[in-house]
Amino acid sequence: VERYEAIRQIAAEIGAHYGQVEVETVADLFAESIGYATPKLDVRGAVFQDDKILMVRGRQDQLWTLPGGWIDVGESPSTAVTKEILEETGYLTKPIKLVACYDRNLWGERPYLQHVYKLFFHCQIISGAPQTSLETDKIAFFAPDDLPPNLSTARVTPSQIHTLFHHYHNPNLPTEFD
């Protein structure tokens, strides 16, 4: 038990250093973790209109990203991406293809405390109108050569967006994965 506690403390110190947070914050997260460690799942929706992709700007960080978020326990990936797009944009959509499943740690971003797999879906608008939310303060469509400079690369990278455009123009391509 003493060895385990010492290792957990060292891990908290390392996590705090790389996550740029207090050691106590990481130690508390470790204390809350129960059971076998498994990855978290993040969904992102690629919605296209007039050869542009739908993006939202986060109210808190003022960074642009694709609409999306964490999959809740008991929720399917397609239900999660549909819900997230509706909540963040006002558009009701239908997922038509799983474009990619990526390991977040392999895409050049600073490591996240938990391991994250990102699921990118191509979705079609069924109905609705642009509407901001508690999480988003702007909604816009962007061309592939005119992406916003303040992109939330922790959520989506420019190369991932270009992959989504490639699949949009070539719908018969297979799903990509790491």
Regions found by a protein language model. Name each.
Residues 23-25, 75-76, 169-171:
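Juxtamembrane/interface motifs at transmembrane-helix termini
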Residues 27-66, 93, 97:
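N-terminal strand-loop-strand
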Residues 3-9, 16, 55-56, 79-84, ...:
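A broad, low-specificity signal for short, low-complexity segments enriched in glycine/proline
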Residues 164-178:
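Acidic/histidine-enriched, glycine/proline-rich intrinsically disordered or flexible terminal extensions
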Residues 2-44:
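Acidic, metal-coordinating catalytic segment for phosphate/diphosphate chemistry
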